[in-house]
């Protein structure tokens, strides 16, 4: 008499689990979008506070946002990217600025 789980290939299930566990996570770009109202100093503050850039790099990125319309602040896993986007957008609203932070798949 056969067992009810003879049709299961436990070795294959284990291999599938290992392969899935070894897959790198999906990565997402966090992007700041230019607007005509947010002060440049505030954008620099955001880049330093939430992305740990020094003042020189934050200034370079702020100028990229200003002149090119947007800039990538970093590339992160989905959870980290979503958290950073929410934190930046909340901080901007708390300070009454329309600065927009978004994410897109890398």
From Swiss-Prot:
SUPFAM superfamilies in the cross-refs: ClpS-like
Pfam families reported for this sequence: ClpS (PF02617)
GO process annotations (BP): protein catabolic process; proteolysis
InterPro entries: ClpS, ClpS_core, Ribosomal_bL12_C/ClpS-like
NCBIfam families: PRK00033.1-3 (NF000670), PRK00033.1-5 (NF000672)
Record's function text: Involved in the modulation of the specificity of the ClpAP-mediated ATP-dependent protein degradation.
Record note on quaternary structure: Binds to the N-terminal domain of the chaperone ClpA.
Family: Belongs to the ClpS family.
Protein name (Swiss-Prot/TrEMBL): ATP-dependent Clp protease adapter protein ClpS
Species assigned in the record: Escherichia fergusonii (strain ATCC 35469 / DSM 13698 / CCUG 18766 / IAM 14443 / JCM 21226 / LMG 7866 / NBRC 102419 / NCTC 12128 / CDC 0568-73)
Gene that this polypeptide is encoded by: clpS
């Amino acid at each position: 008499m056969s067992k009810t789980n003879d049709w299961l290939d436990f070795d294959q299930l284990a291999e599938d689990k290992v392969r899935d566990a070894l897959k790198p996570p999906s990565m997402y770009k966090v992007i700041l979008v230019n607007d005509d109202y947010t002060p440049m100093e505030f954008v620099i503050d955001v880049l330093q506070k939430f992305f740990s850039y020094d003042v020189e790099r934050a200034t370079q990125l702020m100028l990229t946002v200003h002149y090119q319309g947007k800039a990538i602040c970093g590339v992160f896993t989905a959870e980290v990217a979503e958290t950073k986007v929410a934190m930046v957008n909340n901080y901007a609203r708390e300070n009454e600025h329309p600065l927009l932070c978004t994410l897109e798949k890398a």
